């Protein structure tokens, strides 16, 4: 009887013996196969004597046989013992002598056995939001600002204006690297600069020259500037005011072929806001459920699964910045370790929710999700057809739907409270 030993955490070790007869037969068969195609000077193909084949190819054949026997016998055992394997095993050969049993150990990780608990202790706050006319008004203003133009003014700069400036920064009378710029365009009121910089410009007009004194934040990204007091000599070259477009037919037409009036535009905006709100609410509830699941179910995760997830995150990070696989490997694993561990935890816990509740992806919900995605495009019917003909995309949608069903299954047992909220509170929680 084979005994699988627990070494630590999710790591397991097992000793496996392969009978000498099995090894001998495998070596003999492989030598015969090699002999059929071996080319040795002085002999015809396939007619090389066995002792020469053994002398020339014996060592490499035995290594090839070993490389085949180790994983084959391990995976046979893993299947027989119903091992929930995580990652690849490592092998240590203890005996591999001719005519004797092959003895080796395999060290491997398994996925944790999960018994979900504490679902009734999970607390979820569910925002209840109604999109108001004022919310739509605000979004109309956002769209107008996105299409705004700028006009020069002789007035003093305000927090809603844009300025073009030259500046030179110094610390203790010495200029510092990165502290100088010409024709620098700065949109006021957005907090792009260090504290006090924009405030020092407010109230000044084009053509004015002046100095301001500020202090770099203690957490500033440049080490030698942290918490340092600095002086900036500033020249205001231009002050511009924002000119918002009127709600003309031309402006309205930019937002779709079916938007012809202000009412059409507002209806389209409201529909988009409802879609964005739905996604935001789903994400907020999902995050609370996942946080609760992890808090109530502390589980070990396999190092192999975390390592695999780290590589995924590394490659995604490299691609975002235009890099490749080689550059991804240079990114420190510490940057991704916590996120990778959490993703593995979430995957395992949700998989257990799905399994224990015997959930299957609801095809009607998948169809509704595709239609919702398609509604954001000018030709929704074409988008729906594209999804329906792409198996990979359809499977991705089904996986998302299945995950949502798992979240709903947890919600059904959790402590859910509703809280009246505004659109802005949900969409801009950090504001």
Swiss-Prot record:
Pfam family, one: Trigger_N
Classification of source organism: Bacteria, Pseudomonadati, Pseudomonadota, Gammaproteobacteria, Pasteurellales
Cited function: Involved in protein export. Acts as a chaperone by maintaining the newly synthesized protein in an open conformation. Functions as a peptidyl-prolyl cis-trans isomerase.
Molecular function GO labels: peptidyl-prolyl cis-trans isomerase activity; protein folding chaperone; ribosome binding
Family: Belongs to the FKBP-type PPIase family. Tig subfamily.
Protein name: Trigger factor
Keywords, ordered alphabetically: Cell cycle, Cell division, Chaperone, Cytoplasm, Isomerase, Rotamase
Superkingdom of the source species: Bacteria
Taxonomic source organism: Mannheimia succiniciproducens (strain KCTC 0769BP / MBEL55E)
Any one Gene Ontology BP term: protein unfolding
